[in-house]
Amino acid sequence: MMLAQQWRDARPKVAGLHLDSGACSRQSFAVIDATTAHARHEAEVGGYVAAEAATPALDAGRAAVASLIGFAASDVVYTSGSNHAIDLLLSSWPGKRTLACLPGEYGPNLSAMAANGFQVRALPVDDDGRVLVDEASHELSAHPVALVHLTALASHRGIAQPAAELVEACHNAGIPVVIDAAQALGHLDCNVGADAVYSSSRKWLAGPRGVGVLAVRPELAERLQPRIPPSDWPIPMSVLEKLELGEHNAAARVGFSVAVGEHLAAGPTAVRERLAEVGRLSRQVLAEVDGWRVVEPVDQPTAITTLESTDGADPASVRSWLIAERGIVTTACELARAPFEMRTPVLRISPHVDVTVDELEQFAAALREAP
C-alpha cells in the first residue's frame, strides 16, 4: 500500500470521500504549487516572458506524455482538453471523411464527428461493448474507411478495449487509428502503435482542468490541413505548430507537466496494477448492495465501476444525495454520454490508487441508505 499512501500524502486532505477520478482527480501539492508559481511569475514579468521561461517544463511534459504513448516528444501538442483535440484533428482531416467507431462512442465525440462532416459506421462488439477484433478486421478489409476512432476506455462503462490488437488489424488493412485516451492515459497501457492519441489532464493523471494533449505521428501530420492559419498563407509554421496555435492557460500546462512527471515517478506499471486492484475490490464490495447491479465483470483491469439501478432509483438524484448528505463524490452517467449504446443511466465510481476497502464499504453503506 506504499503507492496508495504516497499518493494520498501528496495531496490536500479530502473533504469527504472522492470516488470520481474519471471526472476529475485530486491534484497534488506539487501540481498546485507549480501552477500557482507560474501564475505569479506572469504577474511579475508578463505572461509571454513567463511562458518563454517555462519552455523547459513544457517540453518535459511533452516528453513525459510521449513516453507513455510511444511517440516522439516532437509529435505532441498541448490542447485545452480532449474535446478540443478531437475537433482539431477531425477538422484538419484531408480527403474522404468516413470513420468507424464503437457503438458506445462518447456523445461529445460523436458531435465532433458530425460537426466535421464524418459519416460514422459502428464496429462490431460483444455484449460488454468490447470490440470484436477479428470481425472488425474482416469488415474493414471489405469496406474500408478513412480512419478508425477507438475510445480505449469509455466513461460510461469500465471495459478495457483491445486497443493494440485493433490497431494491428487496422494497419494491416491500411487504415490509420486515432485513440481517445481521455480515460485510459495514466490508467491503461496506451503505447499501442496508434497513429494519433489524445487525452485530458484532469482525469487519471491528476493534472489541472483545461489542459489536454494531442499526439500525431509525422506520416499522418504531414497530410493534415489545419483551418487556421489557411494553408496557402506564406507563414513558416509546421502542421503541429498550427494545431497548437491559440490562447491557452500556460500555468495549467506547467501543472500538467508536473502531474505527468509524478505519474512516471510513481511507476506507470505499478499504477495500472493498483487501479486494476481497485476495480476488483470495488466490484466485490458493491456486488451485494440490494437495488443495484454491477455492470462490469469483476476482473476488468480498470478502476471504473458502474451501477445500474434494479429498483427504479435515479442515478442523478442518488449522486446529489450522496454529495449533500454523505460528502461522497460520484458521477451519474446519463444516456447522452453514449447515446447509441446506453439504455439506462448508471452511477459511476472511479476511485484512484489511494482508496481503501473501508471507504468502499462506507460508500456501499451510503448507497443502501440512499432514497
Swiss-Prot record:
By its UniProt entry, which InterPro entries does this protein fall under? Answer: Aminotrans_V_dom (IPR000192), EgtE (IPR027563), PyrdxlP-dep_Trfase (IPR015424), PyrdxlP-dep_Trfase_major (IPR015421), PyrdxlP-dep_Trfase_small (IPR015422)
Q: Which family does it belong to?
A: Belongs to the class-V pyridoxal-phosphate-dependent aminotransferase family. EgtE subfamily.
Which Pfam families does this entry report, sorted A to Z? Answer: Aminotran_5
Names of the cofactor(s): pyridoxal 5'-phosphate
Protein name (record): Probable hercynylcysteine sulfoxide lyase
Primary enzyme class: lyase
Q: Which reaction equation describes what this protein catalyses?
A: S-(hercyn-2-yl)-L-cysteine S-oxide + AH2 + H(+) = ergothioneine + pyruvate + A + NH4(+)
What gene makes this protein?
egtE
- PTM sites of type N6-(pyridoxal phosphate)lysine: K203
Pathway assignment:
Amino-acid biosynthesis; ergothioneine biosynthesis
Q: Which domain of life is it from?
A: Bacteria
Q: Which GO terms describe its biological process?
A: ergothioneine biosynthesis from histidine via gamma-glutamyl-hercynylcysteine sulfoxide
Which terms are listed as keywords in the entry?
Answer: Lyase, Pyridoxal phosphate
Describe the function of this protein: Probably catalyzes the conversion of hercynylcysteine sulfoxide to ergothioneine. Ergothioneine is a secreted antioxidant that protects mycobacterium from oxidative stress.
